[in-house]
Amino acid sequence: MPARRKYAVRDKWKLKKWYEVIAPPVFGNIVIGTTPADDPLKLIGRVMETTLYDITGDITQVHVRLYFQIIDVKENKAITRFKGHELSRDYIKSLIRRKSSKIQGIFNVVTKDGYHLRLTIIALTSYRCKTSQKRAIRKIMEEYVKERVPQLTLDELIHEMVFGKMSAVIAERARKIYPIRKVEVYKSKLLMIPTPEGPKPAVVISPLQLGR
């Protein structure tokens, strides 16, 4: 019986085909990995993780984790959409210092081309600050993202988040309130996508699951 199972598993793997996973145009449509499937429809909805370093080759960006979701398969290529990003926990821990303050803001935003996202931004001060100063810094975060994001397409927003432009502007403004050591867009998540019928949840489900 165990031998039969062994051969069954082996035969199942023989039926599988490998597909190249393609990053969205904002990341140059490069191949970010490969994934197997015995039916291309089973790939739809699968989430792939990589780092910004794997895309750019810049070792200083190894802490930026990127998530892409497969939305289509064409021949041997799995086409993806940006799902979100997150900075590694080890990197965030390395930024935290004793006798300093951490300010966090979570904001829901909508891009110029109709994509809804949730952004988590953190600011780390050089020294411990007062509650009123924390509130003022959080307000600067909110005012900036609410002012800036509606001017950007999704691709432009992704670029400003992961390459540090957004955090640099917030840090510059926040330093007028209190000495700031670091600002990071710690996390982003795609919530809604635009469709002809209006915004819809950014949920990707395989047609095979829909048919069950």
From Swiss-Prot:
Family, per entry: Belongs to the eukaryotic ribosomal protein eS1 family.
HAMAP family: Ribosomal_eS1
Gene source species: Staphylothermus marinus (strain ATCC 43588 / DSM 3639 / JCM 9404 / F1)
Keyword annotations: Ribonucleoprotein, Ribosomal protein
Gene name in the database record: rps3ae
Entry protein name: Small ribosomal subunit protein eS1
One Pfam family from the record: Ribosomal_S3Ae
SMART domains tied to this protein: Ribosomal_S3Ae
Domain of life per record: Archaea
Gene Ontology cellular component list: ribonucleoprotein complex; ribosome
Gene Ontology molecular function, alphabetical: structural constituent of ribosome
UniProt signal peptide: none
One GO BP annotation of this record: translation
